[in-house]
Amino acid sequence: MSGDVVVFAASSLTDAFKELASEFQKAHPSARAVFSFGGSSQLAIQLINGARADVFASADQDQMDVVQRGRGLAGGQQVFVRNRLMVIAPRDNPAGITSLQDLAKPGIKVVSAQASVPIGYYTAQLLKSASGHADFGGDFQRRVERNVVSREDTVRQIVAKIQLGEADAAVVYVTDVTPRIADQFVRISLPEDLQVTATYPIAVGNGRNPAGGEAFVAFVESPPAQAILARWGFLPPTDGA
């Protein structure tokens, strides 16, 4: 197996997959992983409109299913990691955000994602669940959404908005605040009974290097690669893994 392996991957996988690429090349010296990172929904649209990728790694099941229905996959798909959510605020935290409830306070500037983007879907799921709890109130989701000042196309864009102080708070993946930038944020955990688990499926695409795609998917599922993903904060594909 040799040549470029084109990998379309969710933006939340950027740092982990870049590290994986180095290890993948050590295992396959004649191959090279070439990445296109972006919002899973954007990547799915590209794939069903004719873009060629040897691997597609999505941040949610729906976008993978879209590509499968559009005949953009060469084989089956499987979940390879999971993720969780948290609230972040800028380091100086001018709005005094300390909990999920604070996102509904009048005047709070919240940045979120488009509804078609996985983090947007997961955030809506979280807010809907919270609205069913007496501590939050039945109109909690509506009050938070009223505070949304910007909807981004990727979770990395959301993180950048908070990092630049352009908004007071956002819901992102736990893995998005990497060690390199951790000191620039306040991180706030979610109540465990409201926590949303994001599942990430991966599959071989209809690219020009199917052998390379199969090799990359197999590597991502291997124990060494799973250990790298865990170091970046991702959870194993199942609770028992």
Annotate each PLM feature.
Residues 1-28, 32-37, 41, 45-49, ...:
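Exported/periplasmic ABC-transporter solute-binding proteins
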Residues 72:
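Active-site surface patch of divalent metal-dependent phosphodiester/phosphate bond hydrolases
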Residues 84:
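Short beta-strand->alpha-helix junction loop in the catalytic core
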